[in-house]
């Protein structure tokens, strides 16, 4: 059985940077919101935003929670983030 890596979303790093900027957070502030246990170093945010490192699924879920958006909005290159974000937990099941 051959395993293929899934393609990285082309707009992911831009969207991650956009979330931080729209919410008006520094990298350190964002780390505290993403990882309250403080195991993540703030330099990791820069690596995500520059596309040098791909965030884990748990980190992407935390970004979505902090921004108040659905995970699909982050990883779907056909979806643009709104210019204003709720910045709180939003959960409404999506119909497919």
Predicted regions and their residues:
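Residue-level recognition of specific faces of alpha-helices
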Residues: 15, 44-47, 73
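A short, Lys/Arg-rich alpha-helix, primarily the initiator
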Residues: 1-23
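Short, charged recognition helix plus adjacent turn
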Residues: 1-6, 65, 75-96
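Short alpha-helical elements of helix-turn-helix
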Residues: 14, 28, 42-43, 57-60
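Recognition helix of helix-turn-helix/homeodomain-like DNA-binding domains
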Residues: 35-53
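Short alpha-helical "recognition helix" segments of helix-turn-helix
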Residues: 30-34
């Amino acid at each position: 059985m051959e395993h293929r890596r899934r393609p990285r979303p082309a707009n992911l790093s831009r969207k991650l940077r956009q979330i931080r900027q729209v919410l008006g957070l520094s990298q350190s502030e964002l780390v505290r919101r993403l990882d309250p246990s403080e195991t993540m170093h703030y330099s990791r945010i820069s690596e995500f935003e520059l596309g040098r490192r791909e965030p884990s699924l748990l980190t992407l879920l935390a970004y979505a929670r902090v921004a108040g958006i659905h995970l699909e909005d982050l990883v779907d290159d056909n979806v643009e983030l709104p210019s204003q974000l709720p910045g709180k937990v939003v959960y409404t099941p999506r119909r497919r």
